[in-house]
Amino acid sequence: MRVLAAMSGGVDSAVAAARAVEAGHDVVGVHLALSRMPGTLRTGSRGCCTIEDSRDAWRACDVLGIPYYVWDFSERFKEDVVQDFIDEYAAGRTPNPCMRCNERIKFAALLEKAIALGFDAVCTGHYAKVIEDADGNRELHRAADWAKDQSYVLGVLTHEQLKHSMFPLADTPSKAEVRAEAERRGLSVANKPDSHDICFISDGDTRGWLAEKIDMTTGDIVDETGAKVGEHPGANAFTVGQRRGLKLGTPAADGKPRFVLEIRPKENKVVVGPEALLAIDEIRGIKVSWAGLPISEVATGAEFDCHAQVRAHGDPVPAIARVEAVTDESGVERAQLVVTLTDPLRGVAPGQTVVLYQGSRVLGQATIDAARSLQRQVL
């Protein structure tokens, strides 16, 4: 097969490309330029997508003896990932930019261009697994190394995208083995630290970065009863579950710390309360999609057992889910995912993503529109 290897400049994508070459595929490496000012992106142990990473990707391709190209996706990244991040925070939601990048850049724009150029598949260094059944249908599953598993951030992939996706690290038992293999292959990135945080926020100060992009206006911090307990410099920079950065003039009666329970951007208010009120057991999601073909219960609206995960490395919890049709404010009917959790989760914020699993299989995902406690009816 003709395979396009997405080279991030890290050890995982380098070893994934090496395995694709070793498997006999015709492999071409490509690095995505996601900014026309890469010096503003994070570097070293906490970054990705920088000039340094581009050079590391080139060196890896040189060792592997495969062609290397750089594709400029900076405008699309700015529009589909960076601007989306700003818009979501402005609306009082908490987005996941890495998931959005996978959805709109790596497995949309990149895959579309690859197929147009005659490639059969895109190969990445993600820790996830694609399984094909007897009918040729593709399913997305967790990787062998659950500690490094990245199936959560790939839950947005469609069946058609999975048909053209390769994850050579799927059965690798540990990251240590990947690094050891890179060392044996003479890849200079063998001991390169993993990237973390948000690549387009150079100093990691999300609140400060957002303050330059969003009109921040001081407003009230209120408790769960509506009483004013402090002021904030701008509601949009907060997220549900946050404790740090709250300047409360009125302490809680019990003396215990308070956490952000809700963001109300239209009122420019931040609602705070005790940690216990962060526990939610019902999630309602929009923008529902299925990884592979949806299970039969989706079409009938029947409930089905699953596990729900709301963070990339969070613990999945038992849940019961169903899909129902709802009519939005504009009169358009759309699908809504309703997930009832057996074990409550804390700090679930609108804008985050809930991904559903059955065993190791990823069923699908939705963007969280609302989260509440069925017992307290707080949020």
UniProtKB/Swiss-Prot annotation:
Q: Which domain of life is it from?
A: Bacteria
Q: Provide the site residues for: Interaction with tRNA.
A: 126, 352
The primary location reported for this protein is cytoplasm
Fetch the SUPFAM superfamilies from UniProt. Answer: Adenine nucleotide alpha hydrolases-like (SSF52402)
Cited Pfam families: tRNA_Me_trans (PF03054), tRNA_Me_trans_C (PF20258), tRNA_Me_trans_M (PF20259)
Gene Ontology CC terms, in alphabetical order: cytoplasm
MF-aspect GO terms: ATP binding; tRNA binding; tRNA-uridine 2-sulfurtransferase activity
List the residue ranges of the region (Interaction with tRNA): 148-150
Report the locations given in the UniProt record: Cytoplasm
* Alphabetical list of InterPro entries matching this protein: MnmA-like, MnmA-like_C, MnmA-like_central, MnmA-like_central_sf, Rossmann-like_a/b/a_fold
Q: Which Gene3D superfamilies match?
A: Adenine nucleotide alpha hydrolases-like domains, HUPs, Translation factors
Keywords tagged on the record: ATP-binding, Cytoplasm, Disulfide bond, Nucleotide-binding, RNA-binding, Transferase, tRNA processing, tRNA-binding
BP terms from Gene Ontology: tRNA wobble position uridine thiolation
Q: Where is the active site?
A: 101 (nucleophile), 199 (cysteine persulfide intermediate)
Disulfide-linked positions: 101-199
Which PANTHER family does the record cross-reference, listed alphabetically?
MITOCHONDRIAL TRNA-SPECIFIC 2-THIOURIDYLASE 1, TRNA 5-METHYLAMINOMETHYL-2-THIOURIDYLATE -METHYLTRANSFERASE
The entry's function note states: Catalyzes the 2-thiolation of uridine at the wobble position (U34) of tRNA, leading to the formation of s(2)U34.
The family line of this record is: Belongs to the MnmA/TRMU family.
Name the record gives this protein: tRNA-specific 2-thiouridylase MnmA
